[in-house]
Amino acid sequence: MKNIRRIGLPIVAAFLFQTSAFSQAKPLIELVEIPAGSYYMGSEGKGENFDEAPSHKVNISKAFRMGATEVTNAQYELFRPEHKKLRGKNNVSTEDDDAVVNVSYQDAVDFCQWLSEKEGKTYRLPTEAEWEYACRAGTYTLFYTGDGLSSNMRRNQTIARDYKAVSLKVGQTRPNAFGLYDMHGNVEEWCLDWYGPYSAEEQTDPVGPAEGEFRVTRGGSHHTPDEYLR
């Protein structure tokens, strides 16, 4: 689901994407290998929202590495220590290992730039096509857990919809087949792309429109309906 709706909390997270080879030094972010491959992006004939169609073939031509979890408060605050005063706003994201929230698109880009300079590698946000490919991890169902959420994911979403204080600790639910956590729910995740309609044609490494009004976020959050978690 290409989610740009204005949710009640400005909940976003920067997923890290690394295009260069690993160095011997341990990186700040745990990265997992995502192989090159092809998949069908979007959804069609399954009760999808208008902007999830048409389903179309996308080829990801090169393997890449992606953060195993969403960026945490502790990780982000090495870059921007003053962000700590925003912890706990609206009863979420209070602990070091909670996913960082209250991060704008530009904040996410700046964090990737800072980390690139710090580690001597190239980090950036994923494109929407890369994000969905990584999330699906070879599946063709509505979620990587099947056509419904796992019981753990369901419990987190049910609690959160009461707007009570909830934990945004990363890695609370089982990862997908690629080893990525929290791709459905917890916090929304920024992508590089401007929001725009899908092509009906087969594409290779698409990057979205050249310009637009909104940037894409994917994965939904702890208090968005299931349809926004895709």
Task: Cite the ranges covered by each PLM segment.
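Bacterial N-terminal signal peptides that target proteins for export
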Residues: 2-11
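Intrinsic structural disorder/low-complexity segments
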Residues: 8-9, 21, 147, 160
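Bacterial N-terminal signal peptides
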Residues: 10-18
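Bacterial Sec-dependent signal peptides at the C-terminal "C-region" and cleavage site
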Residues: 18-26
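A short glycine-rich, aromatic-capped structural motif
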Residues: 25-87, 104-106, 185
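Functional-site microenvironments in short loops/helix caps that host divalent-cation chemistry
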Residues: 40, 44-46, 86, 91-99, ...
